[in-house]
Structures are given as C-alpha cells and as structure tokens.
Amino acid sequence: MTSLRKTHPVLKIANDALVDLPTPLNISAWWNFGSLLGLCLITQILTGLFLAMHYTSDISTAFSSVVHICRDVNFGWLIRSIHANGASFFFICLYIHIARGLYYGSYLYNETWNIGVVLFLLVMMTAFVGYVLPWGQMSFWGATVITNLLSAVPYVGDTLVQWIWGGFSVDNATLTRFFAFHFLLPFIIIAMVILHLLFLHETGSNNPLGLNPNMDKIPFHPYFSNKDLLGFVIMLFSLSLLALFSPNLLGDPENFTPANPLVTPPHIKPEWYFLFAYAILRSIPNKLGGVLALLFSILVLMVVPILHTSKQRGMAFRPVTQFLFWTLVADMLVLTWIGGMPVEHPYIIIGQMASILYFSLFLVLFPITGILENKALQWS
C-alpha cells in the first residue's frame, strides 16, 4: 500500500518538498542557510506575535509599552531580546545565503534568484519599519533621515514623504502605519518564500561543483533533514547565548532614551546590517545620487546572472574569481565599518573607494575575469 504522505493532496506537497526531494549528494554546510532563514522567519513571527499582544503603537505610550514588556510581562524581556537579536541572525544567514549563491553560481536559476532579491528587499523593509517601533531616539531619527531620502525623487518627492509620514513630520500616524506594515510584511515574505521554493524545486538544488547532479542524488530525509537539524541547534544556541548574555550588544545606546524631536543624536546610523548600504549612500555628495546608489547596491544583484561570462558555473575551479569574491567580502566589511563612522577625513575617502570597488566588482571585474578564465582554459 502506498504511504499516505505520497497520496494525500496536501501531505504530498510537503512530502515532495521535505521528504522525498531528490537532493545533490555533495551539497556542503553552505546550503544549510536556506532552512536557517526559514527558522529565523518562524522565530521572528512567533516572538513578534507575542510582542504585538502587549505593544501599543502610539507615540505617547510606545516606549513605555516596550519597558512594560521587559519588566512586567512573563518572559517579556526574553521574547523581546530574541526578537531584536533574531533580526541580526536573520541578516547574518541572509548575507551568507546570498554569498553562497554568488560563489557557486546559483544565480543562474534566474527566477529563484530574482525572487530572492525581492525577498531581500522585503526583509530590509520589514527590519527598517520594525526598528522604528520602540520609539527611542535612534528609532525616531533613523525613520526621519531614511524616509526623508524619498524627497530626492524629482517633482513628487516632497509629496511622497508627507504621504508616507501622514503629516509634516514623523509623528503618531507614521508610527501606527509602520506597526501595521511590520505586522503585515512577514506574511507577504512567507508567500514569497513559498514561490522561492516552488521555483527552486522546478530545477533542483545547485551543488559545489556546479555540475549536473541528476545521476547522483539522495532523498532529503533523513540525510539533509538531520544536517539541517544540526544547523538549527547551532543557530538557536548562538542566538540564546547572545540574547541571554549580551542582549544589547548590537543595539544602539541612544534607543534607551525616548524619542525627542528637539534633540538630534550626534551620529545617526541604522542597525549594523544596513551599514554597508548606508556607507554607499553617504559616499555620494548628492542626495538623489546617494539614493540611487543605495537602491542599486541591492538591485545590482539582479544583473549578476546577465553578466555571467564564464563557461563554468561556480567558482570552485576559478582561483582569480575566487580572489575577487573574497575581495567583495572584505569590501562589504570595510563598508560596514565606514557606515558606523562619522562623516570626516579619512572615513569619507575610504567609503568612496570602497563604494567604487563594490560596483566595479559586480559590473566590471567579475565579467572580465570570467572572459579571461575562458581564454586561459582554451590556451591550456
């Protein structure tokens, strides 16, 4: 008799995605981060749901309600700490997941990759509106500065900003709508994740060698389900460690002060996971130019498949491209460091050099190196 999981209309879908999914034999630990992102998303939605039960989206009580959650709600301090630090882990997994896709040429699955880039933008938007909710100093001023960037849009900019604010400044209407968006967006992300997986399972997973693995596949369960489980344990342990021992390590001290429109913090900066994009934004001394650079720093990922010139898929056997890849990683770290620094010499010029290198790697150096490596293969 055929198992119920193979015949039941609903269970069959889950079975084909999680149990009997043919998976390349040789995928490494870098392929764990997709499932880790799923775990992060579920963790964030569950902790967020419990926080939303006690949070009030009103400027007079928002800050106090967060204090109330930490002091009076059963394990409220833990739920908030996991939610705040879970966002950091979400982005760590996200950046590693994208880096894996770049390194092994997974971006050649066009639909999966492009949906992934849209997911990246949605997660960034969710994190940004969520950061505003505790209504601390950096929350307020971060919201003011970032939403103000839209005023750089020609002709409709100022109207657009007032429309998003719901008034002439970041105020109660802004906080209320940001809470609504922060609650809604994760569910849109879930829908996009399902699409992401749908397109991935049309082609099957890529593998470290970049070769067609169809002749050498094994079922996802029990092999990779157990491997994922180990990843879950490591990540949850690391998250617990951070949330319990250093819950404020990655936060901004300014957020311990309630939002005050009359006092500007000395250095306005976003959370650490946005600093690289913030550095690119600041490296252009023109408002519209900076906004476009900020936008293209993410959208440049969409042109990666178009600019793929190599005859090999991944970077496993392409040492020069590997060197460029690690240069990109180092460049991202430099940009992250610069994003958190004040706008003064020598940080300005370092940020500008790092920004030029960032776009050069994607748009010029990777494609040219691919062509040169093809030539080298012909000569050998």
From Swiss-Prot:
What Gene3D superfamilies does this protein map onto?
Answer: Cytochrome Bc1 Complex, Chain C (1.20.810.10)
Q: Which organism is it from?
A: Danio rerio
- Residue positions annotated to bind heme b b562 are 83, 182
Question: Does the keyword section mention Mitochondrion?
Answer: yes
Q: What is its main location?
A: mitochondrion
Q: Where does heme b b566 bind?
A: 97, 196
Q: Which GO terms describe its biological process?
A: mitochondrial electron transport, ubiquinol to cytochrome c
Instruction: Provide the protein name.
Output: Cytochrome b
A further note on this protein reads: Heme 1 (or BL or b562) is low-potential and absorbs at about 562 nm, and heme 2 (or BH or b566) is high-potential and absorbs at about 566 nm.
